[in-house]
Structure formats: structure tokens, C-alpha cells
UniProtKB/Swiss-Prot annotation:
The record's free-text note on cofactor binding: Binds 1 Mg(2+) ion per subunit. Can also utilize other divalent metal cations, such as Ca(2+), Mn(2+) and Co(2+).
InterPro entries: THDP-binding, Transketo_C/PFOR_II, Transketolase-like_C_2, Transketolase-like_Pyr-bd, Transketolase_bac-like, Transketolase_BS, Transketolase_CS, Transketolase_fam
GO MF term set: metal ion binding; transketolase activity
Homology family: Belongs to the transketolase family.
Protein name stated in the entry: Transketolase
Taxonomic source organism: Cereibacter sphaeroides
Protein's UniProt keywords contain Magnesium: yes
Other known facts: This protein is encoded within the form II ribulose-bisphosphate carboxylase operon.
Gene behind this protein: tklB
Protein residues bound to Mg(2+): 158, 188, 190
Residues annotated as binding thiamine diphosphate: 71, 120-122, 159, 188, 262, 434
A GO BP annotation: reductive pentose-phosphate cycle
Cofactor: Mg(2+); Ca(2+); Mn(2+); Co(2+)
Active site (catalytic residues): 408
Enzyme Commission number(s): 2.2.1.1
Length: 657
């Protein structure tokens, strides 16, 4: 593990400090304090323990490194440069925080090789890492130690541990006994406002211990103490937290230990003083050859480990299944869904779309054995568990269903981690009203382009008596506002099946399924192999020369169809458009959109706010929906009370003809 002397290891750490100082100074912005404070911990971790191969950055059995304290991004960029990642040359370091550079202010997944997750919103990294560590154990249970046997390491700061999401993650990681998860806490006792004591008195080690973690402490500037703590953590069957007592901005003689060094350049004079204090006499952005060689040995060790793993993979009888899962090969799903849709159109079941989702999951999970489901303690309501799914439990990771507990935010972040890890395809459910508890992680799913599926049930006043605390009103508009998120609100069992096909075959877009509690009739009774939901919106009823176009989503589509019948009885030709996914419709060619929407006046209908309907409706068009919060009553009474009815659609249509 350790193959160089202590003095050289210190110089390796000082190379990180120098690059962090210089890059932040050149950018005139950034966070030098954390990289300088945690350089010793990170150097020991990479030099003696962590296994990665920069020449094969996606190697499945690499160790995962998550910089939860993402503001300290120069720590990660400096390490990747020193390790020899091909896309992290010195020009990238010089271009820190500049437009078009891979070295963004906070690490962004996909911008550079080896960045495992986008971090920056504090706490997201540690919670995502729980998902990664869980994925490692689940895959290990499927494929064995020869193919899956690695650690997930996290560097987290005080801010990460103060954020509420970290408590959900700590609880979940400890409960499941994720022994391959090691959190290195940057215990510098500094926040942006000052000493951490001005805002917290918590012994940060205590919550970890209470949740079943193995808790250690070390001097974060004493390499042998750091190494001993990591070694002990690796041996323990529990997840581990190591409190690394550090000095923020270590090496800057006049600023270290203070909050001013957290998020601002040191300045030329302080950098010169730091160079003298550290014994670093090299010009800015210059690393001596022997240090490149020392860091290169780490990369070479990783390459050897990867080559040995490749040999084991070639000889493994599980190779085909492993490679199919790693490639996320979903080719078996579309034909299975097409055949299933034909049965649905013939049988025309009247079921809630949450029930239709459960039915579709029977097809999905049979076609895709690497799909893994779960719910935030609402399995019986979300209906996210299909027949035959086995629960994941502490020490028993061979199953495919995860009980996330009442931890919506932690669930969403963990699903990001499972998806980022690779080899598994996660989905998880909660009530639509609680999407707000998941929102920061949903936003990161979209920002990273990670194909996670969020199952949101009880989608409107249609849930009835639970009342306005549980009735989504503004949620559809706010979720549709997130770029690169496909929000799909299907109207029947056929559209629900199509929505699942879209979600599970997506490669760079998360999907959020919006599902009803109340039963809905099948409106797609004529089978089409084509996935019409993938169009975003389509003509469900075309009367030819239309006088008005009625547009609806989800449970309100049956109201639009009823309104069209009422209008037809009066000799008024109304087209009906089903619009399950605004984002997919916006991506269609302009001529298709024009054909679907037509030139006649339009009326939209959705049991939610009108906000976000500009794609379909102009100021002159009508909308039948909600204008405020809901109420507690049976669903039919609520639809009447809030005037979301076929008659209201007819009235709005006639006013515009």
C-alpha cells in the first residue's frame, strides 16, 4: 500500500495545496481552504488505499470517491491532474471556473472523467454515496467478490453534516450495514460565518454512532494516524466515519484556521508566505517530475488491479449477465411493452394509474432483471413492488426492492447514487405532494442526466379526504420547470405502460411519473405499436374540421372526452388532445406540434395550476383547473366544488368559439 517515504508523501500533498492556491488566485474566485486542509488526508487515501485507473475511468470495480464538500473542487481536480487523467491537463487547472473548462466551480458529473457525481449542494454527496455503497453490495450479492468488491469513500465537511439530508443518509447507511462506505469528515470547525460553534453544539460523531456506524478520529495532518484510521475502517463490517481534525487553509501562515480562507483567493502575499512555509519553491502551475512519478505509481497500481479484474471477468460464468447490466441493455423492454399494450387495449381495465403502474412493473421487472425498486414507506400506496420482488435488508442484498423508510430526500439521492454506480436501474415512490422533499436530488438527477425514475402517486385533489396538505396543486408546474426532467402524467393503463417504457429506456434524462389514486377508464382502446406518449401529446380524437381543441392530462382526459361528447351533441366539433408529457411534446418537430394543436381555440384541463401551460395555451385560450389549494372531502365532491367538470370545459369552449 505505502511505497514512498513520509517526506515524499507530504510533498505529494503540498502539490495539491499549490495547485489549489494558484488556480483559485488565477480565477480570482474559489475555495482554497478545504483543499489545503484536507490535502494530507486525500493524499494518504489515494496513495495507500483507493484504487482507480485513470486510463479506464469507468472500470466497474473501481473504488468510488465522492467529494461531498464540492466547494473544495480543486482538491479533486488537482488529484486527477496528478494521477494523469487524460482530460485534466494543466491548461484545465489554469482555466479553473472559466466558461467551457472541465474544471467548474463545483465538480460536475460528465464534465471530466473520474468525477463520480455532481456535488456542491451540501449533504447531497454523502447521501448519494449511500446509494453507491448500497449498489456495490447489491451487485456483490449478484456477481460475487471476483467481479464486485470495492469501497466508497466520501470527504464531507461540517456543512454536509448539518444539512438534513445527511441525517437521513446516515440513518439508512447504518441500518443497512454498508461496511464498504467510509466517510472522512473534514473536522476543521469552521463555517462561512465563523467558528462552527456559533451555529451548532452537536458532537457530529454521536449521530453516526447512534445509527450503528464505526466512529474513529485522527489528526488530519498526521499521515500515519490517517492511515491507521482508514485501515481500521476498512476492516470493520460497519460503515465508518473518521473525524479528521484539520486546519482549514493549512500552510497559509496568516490565514489558516480562519473562516476568511474558506471561499476567497489567498492573495499574492499570502501565497508567497505559504510557499515559504511549505517549502514549495516552484513557480505557479509547475509540478516537479518526481511528484508526477509518485502520483503515477498510484495510477499504475490501479491499472494492475483493473487488468487482474478483466482476467477474472473473462473467466466468469456471470460475464454475460454482468455486461448486460453494465451496458443498461433495455432492448427487451419495448417489444414486451408493445405486447402488453395490445392486451390492455383489448381488456380496457378501469384502474388508477398507480395500479396501472404496478401492472406495468410486472412487465418491466421481468424484462429488466437489473431494475431495482423501492418506496419511502408507501409501498402499499405507491404500488411500486411487483410480484416476486425480494426486499433488501441488512446483510441481505440479493433482493431488488429497497425500503427507504420515511426519508424521501435520502431516497432520491440514494437512487442517484445507485444509477451513477452503474449496473442497476433504480425507481422509487412517494406521494406527489412530497416531491418537494425530494426536489434538490431530482434537480441533480436532471443536471447530471441520470436516468432515475421517480414514481409520484396521489397526484391531485383526486386523492380526496387527506386534504390540501397531501393534494398537489403547484407541484406539476414547479417540476416541469426543471430542465431535462420528463414529467409524465398518463391518463390510463396504456399511457402508463408507455410511460414506463420511456422511463426505463431513457439514457440521459430522469423521468417523473405522476399517477392517480382514483380509478380511470382506458381511453386508448385501439392498439398502436407506436409509443404515442413518447410524442408528448397527440390527437386522441380528431373530428376533422375542428372548432375547438380540448387538451388534458391524466385523470382529466376523461373529462375532456365527455366535454367533446357534449359539444358534439350541440353540433360543435371538438378535437381532444392527450398531453401526458410537456417536455417530450416541446421536443417534437414544429409541424407535428402545429398539426396536433390546430388553429382553433383551445381549452386546457388539469387538476392543477395553469402555470406552465404556455406551450399549449395562449392568453386568449381557456383553462379549467385549480387556482388555489384543495380541501378535505371525497374526490367527486372536490371536482364539483372546484368546478373541474366536463360542463366547465364546455362552457369555456363555447365562450371561445
Amino acid at each position: 500500500m505505502k511505497d514512498i517515504g513520509a517526506a515524499q508523501e507530504t510533498r505529494m500533498a503540498n502539490a495539491i495545496r499549490a495547485l489549489a492556491m494558484d488556480a483559485v488566485e488565477k480565477a480570482k474566485s474559489g475555495h482554497p481552504g478545504m483543499p489545503m486542509g484536507m490535502a494530507d488526508v486525500a493524499t494518504v487515501l489515494f496513495n495507500r488505499f483507493l484504487t482507480v485507473d485513470p486510463s479506464a475511468p469507468k472500470w466497474p470495480d473501481r473504488d468510488r470517491f465522492v467529494l461531498s464538500a464540492g466547494h473544495g473542487s480543486m482538491l479533486l481536480y488537482a488529484i486527477h491532474h496528478l494521477l494523469g487523467y487524460a482530460d485534466m491537463d494543466m491548461d484545465q487547472i489554469r482555466s479553473f471556473r472559466q466558461l467551457g473548462a472541465r474544471t467548474a466551480g463545483h465538480p460536475e458529473y460528465g464534465h471530466a472523467e473520474g468525477i463520480e457525481v455532481t456535488t456542491g449542494p451540501l449533504g447531497q454527496g454523502i447521501a448519494t454515496a449511500v446509494g453507491m455503497a448500497l449498489a456495490e453490495r447489491m451487485k456483490n450479492a449478484r456477481y460475487g467478490d471476483d467481479l464486485v468488491d470495492h469501497f466508497t469513500y466520501v470527504i464531507a465537511g461540517d456543512g454536509c453534516l448539518m444539512e438534513g439530508i445527511s441525517h437521513e443518509a446516515i440513518d439508512m447507511g447504518g441500518h443497512l450495514g454498508l461496511g464498504r462506505l467510509i466517510v472522512l469528515w473534514d473536522d476543521n470547525r469552521i463555517t462561512i460565518d465563523g467558528d462552527s460553534g456559533i451555529s451548532t453544539s452537536t458532537d457530529q460523531k454521536a449521530p453516526f454512532a447512534a445509527s450503528g456506524w464505526h466512529v474513529l478520529a485522527c489528526d488530519g495532518h498526521a499521515p500515519e494516524e490517517i492511515a491507521a484510521a482508514i485501515e481500521a475502517a476498512r476492516r470493520d463490517p460497519r460503515p465508518s466515519m473518521i473525524a479528521c481534525r484539520t486546519v482549514i487553509g493549512y500552510g497559509a501562515p496568516n490565514k489558516q484556521g480562519g473562516h476568511d480562507v474558506h471561499g476567497a483567493p489567498l492573495g499574492a502575499a499570502e501565497i508567497a508566505a505559504a510557499r515559504e512555509r511549505l517549502g514549495w519553491d516552484h513557480p505557479p502551475f509547475e509540478i516537479p517530475a518526481d511528484l508526477y512519478e509518485a502520483w503515477g505509481r498510484i495510477a499504475a497500481r490501479g491499472a494492475d488491479a483493473r487488468a487482474a479484474w478483466e482476467t477474472r471477468l473473462q473467466a466468469s460464468p456471470l460475464r454475460a449477465a454482468f455486461e448486460t447490466a453494465e451496458a443498461a441493455d433495455t432492448s427487451a423492454l419495448p417489444p414486451a411493452i408493445a405486447a402488453y399494450k395490445a392486451r390492455l387495449s383489448a381488456e380496457a381495465p378501469k384502474v388508477a394509474t398507480r395500479k396501472a403502474s404496478e401492472m406495468a412493473l410486472g412487465v418491466v421487472n421481468e424484462a429488466l432483471p437489473f431494475a431495482v425498486g423501492g418506496s419511502a414507506d408507501l409501498t402499499g400506496s405507491n404500488l411500486t413492488r411487483s410480484k416476486g420482488m425480494v426486499s433488501v435488508a441488512p446483510g441481505a442484498f440479493a433482493g431488488s426492492y429497497i425500503h427507504y423508510g420515511i426519508r424521501e430526500h435520502g431516497m432520491a439521492a440514494a437512487m442517484n447514487g445507485i444509477a451513477l454506480h452503474g449496473g442497476l436501474r433504480p425507481y422509487g415512490g412517494t406521494f406527489m405532494a412530497f416531491a418537494d422533499y425530494c426536489r434538490p436530488s431530482i434537480r441533480l438527477s436532471a443536471l447530471m442526466g441520470v436516468p432515475v425514475t421517480y414514481v409520484m402517486t396521489h397526484d391531485s385533489i383526486g386523492l380526496g379526504e387527506d386534504g390540501p396538505t397531501h393534494q398537489p396543486v403547484e407541484h406539476l408546474a414547479s417540476l416541469r420547470a426543471i430542465p431535462n426532467l420528463a414529467v409524465i402524467r398518463p391518463a390510463d393503463a396504456v399511457e402508463t405502460a408507455e410511460a414506463w417504457e420511456i422511463a426505463m429506456t431513457a439514457t440521459s434524462t430522469p423521468t417523473l411519473l405522476v399517477l392517480s389514486r382514483q380509478n380511470l377508464p382506458t381511453v386508448r382502446t385501439e392498439h398502436r405499436d407506436e409509443n404515442l406518449t413518447a410524442r408528448g401529446a397527440y390527437l386522441l380524437r380528431d373530428p376533422g374540421e375542428r372548432q375547438v381543441t380540448l387538451i388534458a392530462t391524466g385523470s382529466e382526459l376523461e373529462l375532456a372526452l365527455a366535454a367533446a361528447d357534449l359539444l358534439a351533441a350541440e353540433g360543435i366539433a371538438a378535437a381532444v388532445v392527450s398531453a401526458p408529457c410537456f417536455e417530450l411534446f416541446a421536443a417534437q418537430p414544429a409541424d407535428y406540434r402545429a398539426t396536433v394543436l390546430g388553429r382553433a381555440p383551445r381549452v386546457g384541463c388539469e387538476a392543477a395550476l395553469r402555470q406552465g401551460w404556455d406551450l399549449f395555451l395562449g392568453p386568449q385560450d381557456g383553462f379549467v383547473g385549480m387556482t388555489g389549494f384543495g380541501a378535505s372531502a371525497p374526490a367527486p365532491a372536490l371536482y364539483q366544488h372546484f368546478n373541474i367538470t366536463a360542463e366547465a370545459i364546455v362552457k369555456s369552449a363555447k365562450e371561445r368559439i
